[in-house]
Amino acid sequence: YVDGYPGESCFNCVMPGMSEIIVITSGKGGVGKTTTAVNIAASIGYYGYRVLLVDADPQGNATSGFGIQKRTVDRSTYEVLLGQCSARDAILTTPFKGVEVIPSSMALAAAELELADMRDRVMRLKEELVRVKGEYDFVLIDCPPSLGMVTLNALSACDSLIIPIQCEYYALEGLSQLVTTVRQVKRLYNPGIEIEGVLLTMYDGRLNLTL
């Protein structure tokens, strides 16, 4: 608790002029990934920090969650990844204090195939985010529910990741695959990447697996 508010001390470790890129990913859907990303972004913004949320999920629920109508989006994460616009040109303001968004669009679903034949296909998001990173205290990336090319771009660009995991058996199986992918990214593309932690979601104390 700081000044009567729970959680504020979690962000006091950020030094002035420093910023951190954090990926929210699980490698599968339905585990509360987007809910986690939206709530962390809104909470950090509430405490006075500058936050950029990059919606890299074609479903675009994080975009909608911050009051942006997807049908009105002209520039999205898709255009940024394909080099059709800069990250700065895709940024939109939101009604939420301190939070700006690079929105998603349904076109992002096609990015997996289009990126496959491109040069530096895994580093394209990083190349754009380094140009705007210094304008924010935190950059959060909400990933798609898969370990494809878009997620690899996010992992290659980030400093750390948070892994939401549902308290059930098959989620544990998916965690192993994600950790293996992170190790490969660390070896090949991003030696500084670290796992911030695993966040248990949809907790049910009646289940043995939860305990």
Question: Model-derived features: where do they sit?
Answer:
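P-loop NTP-binding core
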Residues: Y1-L211
